[in-house]
Amino acid sequence: MFGGNMRIFEVMRETKETNIYLKINIDGTGKYKIDTGIPFFDHLLASFAKHGCFDLIVKARGDLEIDDHHTVEDVGICLGLALNQIEKRNIFRFGWAIIPMDDARATVAIDLSGRSYCVGNYEPKREFVGDLATENINHFFESVASYGMLNIHYEVIGKNEHHKAEALFKAFGVALDLATKIDERKGVISTKGEVKL
């Protein structure tokens, strides 16, 4: 799961609200071990890892007695911090995916640009799917973009909220897998000569 000459990043974050450990192998095979205390969120992160072919470990403990906001937010922050460690030379940089799931379809486009921006149109019709507050899905992606210094655009259509959310996380994984692919021809993919703030 983790070994060899691979791009592996590890983040730990502890606050009064949460305690998060996250480890991701960008060059993995889609193995995962996830426990956030929010089973449907675990399912979404597993879908991201599996379809992006990332090996992912997430151990999170948060103030779920209040609600799930801080846990979802801080996992997003940790994933963003991990992704921000990716060497920007010799990667594809851009990634995109259109993923259907029954009635739902999600489109994701990302740019590992060194600039954070998140634009999404996920508008849930239900307050919860399982034990996850659906409003926190948008906040998760905002947190990833902000701390990962990447640009994320996403659109979701469909009827079933489970399908919409799962298609979105699958599409994010597939798009990120493409963006992080090694391509020795590319060097730094910017007319500025660098990808950072």
UniProtKB/Swiss-Prot annotation:
Gene Ontology cellular-component annotations: cytoplasm
Compartments it resides in: Cytoplasm
Pfam families: IGPD (PF00475)
Gene3D superfamilies: Imidazole glycerol phosphate dehydratase, domain 1 (3.30.230.40)
Molecular function per GO: imidazoleglycerol-phosphate dehydratase activity
Alphabetized SUPFAM superfamilies for the sequence: Ribosomal protein S5 domain 2-like (SSF54211)
Pathway: Amino-acid biosynthesis; L-histidine biosynthesis; L-histidine from 5-phospho-alpha-D-ribose 1-diphosphate: step 6/9
GO biological process, one term: L-histidine biosynthetic process
PANTHER family for this protein: IMIDAZOLEGLYCEROL-PHOSPHATE DEHYDRATASE, IMIDAZOLEGLYCEROL-PHOSPHATE DEHYDRATASE HIS7
Family recorded in the similarity comment: Belongs to the imidazoleglycerol-phosphate dehydratase family.
Protein name, entry field: Imidazoleglycerol-phosphate dehydratase
Gene: hisB
